[in-house]
A protein has these predicted regions:
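Class I SAM-dependent methyltransferase SAM/SAH-binding core
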Residues: 75-156
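A short acidic, Gly/Pro-enriched loop at the edge of an enzyme's catalytic core
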Residues: 158-170
Length: 179
């Protein structure tokens, strides 16, 4: 799998649709426009399962847990786990904002305030994705607590990524494996 212009190539997955262009955007407006138009439902189907697993692990361990989201993209699983949201609501939010004149910096500020306005579950989420713009956005708005931006199919984990993974209790994925 070769990297080109900071995105990932779809060659190993020729049967799958290629969404390279939406993962190189500096914010999630195009991501939600495209995937929302395809009736993308995997995160919604998985969120209650993830929430139940998290609750069970917290009860078992007696402490907040740490989650790794493989293929985290712009943090949609984190948003759905942390807050009473669904994919359609996020999609509508970003489609509505798509035609605004907001810069990415302004959208980051708006989203940071939006997500901070909800009661927060004491949970650490590490996002892992090949898209630096996507993980940077998710981290900047507070959806993920740490980011690993590496192509794990081509390179071994660097030390900072290994450090970020210490103490992970649960690994989830809807964007890298489920489709």
């Amino acid at each position: 799998m070769e990297t080109r212009n900071g995105s990932f190539a779809c060659e190993p997955n020729k049967a799958k649709a290629c969404f390279d262009s939406i993962y190189t955007e500096p914010d999630p407006r195009e991501y939600y426009r495209v995937l929302g138009g395809l009736d993308y439902v995997i995160p919604d189907l998985a969120k209650d399962i993830f929430r139940n697993l998290i609750a069970a692990l917290e009860q078992l361990r007696g402490r907040p847990i740490k989650v790794l989201d493989l293929g985290c993209s712009y943090g949609n699983n984190a948003a759905l786990i942390r807050f009473p949201l669904d994919f359609a609501r996020l999609q509508q939010r970003y489609v509505d904002l798509q035609h605004s004149n907001l810069s990415t910096r302004e959208l980051i500020t708006l989203d940071r305030h939006f997500f901070q306005s909800w009661p927060r579950h004491d949970l650490a989420i590490v996002g892992c994705d090949v898209s630096r713009p996507a993980t940077a956005y998710a981290r900047a708005v507070g959806l993920i607590d740490d980011a690993i931006t590496q192509n794990l199919e081509q390179e071994p984990l660097i030390q900072s990524s290994k450090d970020a993974l210490k103490g992970v209790d649960l690994i989830i994925s809807t964007g890298a494996i489920g489709y």
